[in-house]
A protein has these predicted regions:
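PP2C/PPM-type serine/threonine phosphatase catalytic domain
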Residues: 1-230
Length: 230
């Protein structure tokens, strides 16, 4: 996906529209390309599908693009801010879109498209077209000095942990690891961000999460040199 996005961005640079619009087009086209490539999978291509949450970081912007119920959360100071909105079949606008196409949302262990899929957008899952679509939602957030980290995770984490709890865990562990690193006390080769991701994953497993658990944490604070390296 990274290479596809880079190609689409390079293609959009020469189009002459505003930078936000270029990103929207580049990301949407990238998701469409990824969706098209799913049909090349040898085994049951119509049944293969995935969510996706993409983050592009610049010096002043956080750009997100998501399809499905993987989520991007920003820890900013003491706040925890969801930068994406899960695309669920019972979300009012998604429900209206599905029903306008002749689809149905059935409650079967939660709201599901035709009682099958618990998300309303995805890459793949072509057997549920045109109700489940690979069209991402794109957001733009201006960075601030208070930004601590991003948590990018699949629903295996969010099913058992709220945004606020995940943010609290991340802040607490980041502060502790950074302080220890600054004092030269951490020598396990694990970055503060990786330590947070590992910890969140362990919590989800400990709570018997039943879904895929994929967690990425991005440290948004500039690296500080330890006293020995100053």
């Amino acid at each position: 996906m990274h290479g596809v996005i880079a190609e689409e961005w390079d293609r959009e640079v020469g189009e002459g529209c505003g930078w936000q619009r270029r990103w929207e087009v580049a990301l949407s086209t990238s998701f469409e390309r990824a969706d098209s490539e799913v049909v090349t999978v040898a085994v049951a291509p119509e049944m293969v599908g995935s969510t996706a949450a993409i983050v592009v970081l610049s010096g002043c912007q956080i750009i997100t693009s998501n399809c499905g119920d993987s989520r991007v959360v920003l820890c900013r100071g003491t706040e925890t801010i969801a930068l994406t909105v899960d695309q669920k079949p019972d979300r009012q606008d998604e429900l209206m879109r599905i029903e306008s196409e002749g689809g149905r949302v059935i409650n079967w262990n939660g709201a599901r498209v035709f009682g099958v899929l618990a998300m309303s957008r995805a890459i793949g899952d072509r057997y549920l077209r045109p109700w489940v679509i690979p069209v991402p939602e794109v957001t733009f957030t201006t960075r601030t000095d208070d930004d601590e980290c991003l948590i990018i995770a699949s629903d295996g984490l969010w099913d058992v942990m709220s945004n606020e709890e995940a943010g609290q865990v991340a802040r607490r562990l980041l502060i502790r690891r950074r302080r220890r690193a600054l004092m030269g006390e951490v020598d396990d080769g694990v970055s503060p961000a990786q330590a947070v991701a590992d910890n969140l994953t362990a919590i989800a497993i400990g709570r018997n999460s039943c879904d895929n658990i994929s967690v990425i944490v991005v440290d948004l604070k500039p690296k500080r040199k330890s006293p020995s390296n100053a």
